[in-house]
Design a protein with these regions (language model features):
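A short core secondary-structure module
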Residues: 69-109
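Cytochrome P450 core scaffold surrounding the K-helix E-X-X-R motif
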Residues: 50, 109, 136-142
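Short Gly/Pro-enriched turn/cap motifs at secondary-structure boundaries
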Residues: 32, 47-50, 74-77, 89, ...
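Helix-loop "lid/cap" segments that line or gate small-molecule binding pockets
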Residues: 10-18
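Flexible, small-/acidic-enriched active-site or ligand-binding loops
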Residues: 54, 103-132
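Conserved hydrophobic/aromatic beta-strand scaffold that supports enzyme active sites
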Residues: 40, 56-58, 83-87, 97-99, ...
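Alpha-helical interface subdomain recognition
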Residues: 4-7, 19-24, 31-36, 51, ...
Length: 297
């Protein structure tokens, strides 16, 4: 559900609101906001993940419109989306955003099966074969990688908060269990090793909460930048991953069943740890901000 809401708000409604025409906003935003319409975001490709700027999807001029060819991979809500925000390179190699509608000739989607993570979330591949769209389908307010990257900043901000919630649930679930589960005549919460684990978990959760709270206040003030968001996404995903693992351990054998939430969170965090920028990419984004020297293209 968090992934669904993140895509709908940060990756679909945001670019339409920030970069769309008046007509595009009036057509799509009310329905998307009410949940009557579903959107998806097409940036990642089979051969271009972290290096999204190398995308192979093209948008060629064709009279007053465009012809779009290419494919997008790992797209949340892809097969159920009424509208897709698709990023493609034009004849001058400039990245532009387009709104593709469900049912357009040459536009199709297929679901990806066999996932062990985000199993409740629809993940799809998008295919565009000579999809003809009018110029009115183009997002007029942006060009270049600034467009999709600014969307990712919004989504990463939400992820930092979402991981805080995952971590808190894992902690609370494990704590309740540890107080009730008795071994050697007393609750396992009464042992020093277990208490040390809870101390570390709660300290990390508090750090996560303080980071996103500070980030939220900066966002409200208009002073938040993408480097800071990268730090929060990187930090909170890593901490949530550690906390989910520790919570699973405290639950013992019961922890590998779906009766308890940490194993589900642990599996889902593996996806979140990767999407919207890997741990390594965020490390380099922060490193560039610190040193002023880019370690990547």
């Amino acid at each position: 559900l968090r992934s669904f809401a993140s895509v709908q708000g940060s990756l679909v409604m945001y670019p339409i609101h920030a970069f769309g025409s008046v007509e595009q906003k009036e057509k799509w935003l009310p329905g998307l906001g009410k949940g009557e319409l579903v959107g998806c975001f097409g940036l990642t490709e089979p051969n271009y993940g972290s290096n999204a700027g190398g995308m192979a999807t093209t948008a060629k001029r064709n009279g007053d419109g465009w012809v779009i060819n290419g494919s997008k991979m790992w797209i949340t809500n892809g097969s159920i989306a009424d509208v897709a925000v698709v990023w493609a390179k034009d004849d001058d190699d400039v990245v532009r955003g387009f709104l593709l509608e469900k049912g357009m000739d040459g536009y199709s989607s297929n679901d990806i099966h066999g996932k062990l993570s985000l199993r409740a979330s629809i993940t799809s591949e998008l295919a565009m074969v000579n999809v003809q769209v009018p110029d009115s389908a183009r997002l007029p307010g942006v060009e270049g990688m600034k467009g999709p990257l600014s969307c990712l900043t919004q989504a990463r901000y939400g992820i930092a908060w979402g991981m805080t919630g995952c971590a808190a649930d894992c902690y609370q679930t494990a704590l309740k269990y540890a107080k009730e589960r008795k071994q050697f005549s007393k609750p396992i919460a009464g042992y020093q090793l277990t208490q040390a684990k809870f101390t570390e978990m709660l300290t990390k959760i508090t750090e996560m909460q303080l980071m996103v709270l500070r980030l939220g206040r900066m966002k409200d003030a208009g002073t938040m930048n993408f480097h800071q968001v990268s730090m929060a996404k990187r930090n909170n995903c890593a901490m949530a991953r550690d906390i989910a693992k520790t919570a699973r351990e405290i639950l013992g054998a019961n922890g590998v069943t779906l009766d308890y939430s940490p194993i589900r969170h642990l599996a889902n965090i593996e996806s979140v740890f990767t999407y919207e920028g890997t741990h390594e990419m965020h490390t380099l984004i922060i490193g560039e901000d610190i040193t002023g020297i880019s370690a990547f293209e």
